[in-house]
Amino acid sequence: MHQVVCATTNPAKIQAILQAFHEIFGEGSCHIASVAVESGVPEQPFGSEETRAGARNRVANARRLLPEADFWVAIEAGIDGDSTFSWVVIENASQRGEARSATLPLPAVILEKVREGEALGPVMSRYTGIDEIGRKEGAIGVFTAGKLTRASVYHQAVILALSPFHNAVY
């Protein structure tokens, strides 16, 4: 059984990681542990590189905390231009897989508050009245009318980041 450490306590991220690992390695093949670790970047990262650095830092911090695991996984959400997206970073003892999620264009009224220094989650919670929306459907769920959620978009990126771990060509 694979021991997988999720460098997050966010239920939407954990759900995406668990589902993707079960799809790739088989139902019941993984034990998931969740840990809160620092990203080393601002609460609301801007740009692809800062966001990816946050995910890489979370993986490194999770590895230091639980070095006996088989996989360490981090999902870091950020803002790039006028859109929100995330980076997924997965490592095992010998390799790394990374993938960037789909992007969601954000309305100007939301971007204005984020650019003033607020994190997207609290801005969206105020806008929607949904407490801790970032731990639930997120802006993605709101602006896609529930057709997608944070977890569903993260799930796809986790599947992509897992590619090196089950394909010999890597």
From Swiss-Prot:
pH dependence of activity: Optimum pH is 6.75.
Catalytic activity: XTP + H2O = XDP + phosphate + H(+); ITP + H2O = IDP + phosphate + H(+)
InterPro entries listed in its UniProt record: ITPase-like_fam, Non_canon_purine_NTPase, NTPase/PRRC1, YjjX_NTPase
Domain of life: Bacteria
Cofactor entry: Mg(2+); Mn(2+)
Function: Phosphatase that hydrolyzes non-canonical purine nucleotides such as XTP and ITP to their respective diphosphate derivatives. Probably excludes non-canonical purines from DNA/RNA precursor pool, thus preventing their incorporation into DNA/RNA and avoiding chromosomal lesions. ITP and XTP are the best substrates, followed by GDP and dITP. Is not active on dATP and dGTP, and exhibits no phosphatase activity toward pyrimidines (CTP, TTP, UTP, dCTP, and dTTP). Also seems to be implicated in the resistance against the thiamine metabolism inhibitors bacimethrin and CF3-HMP.
Similarity comment text for this entry: Belongs to the YjjX NTPase family.
UniProt KW keywords: Antibiotic resistance, Hydrolase, Magnesium, Manganese, Metal-binding, Nucleotide metabolism, Nucleotide-binding
Protein's gene: yjjX
Regulation: Competitively inhibited by ATP, GTP and TTP.
Free-text cofactor note: Binds 1 divalent cation per subunit. Activity is maximal in the presence of Mg(2+), while Mn(2+) decreases the activity by 20%.
GO BP terms, alphabetized: nucleotide metabolic process; response to antibiotic; thiamine metabolic process
Binding positions for Mg(2+) per the UniProt entry: E38, E68
Recorded GO MF terms: ITPase activity; magnesium ion binding; nucleotide binding; protein homodimerization activity; ribonucleoside triphosphate phosphatase activity
Subunit structure as annotated in this protein's UniProt entry: Homodimer.
EC number: 3.6.1.73
Protein name per the record: Inosine/xanthosine triphosphatase
Residues noted as binding substrate in the record, renumbered to the chain: T8, T9, N10, P11, A12, K13, E68, A69
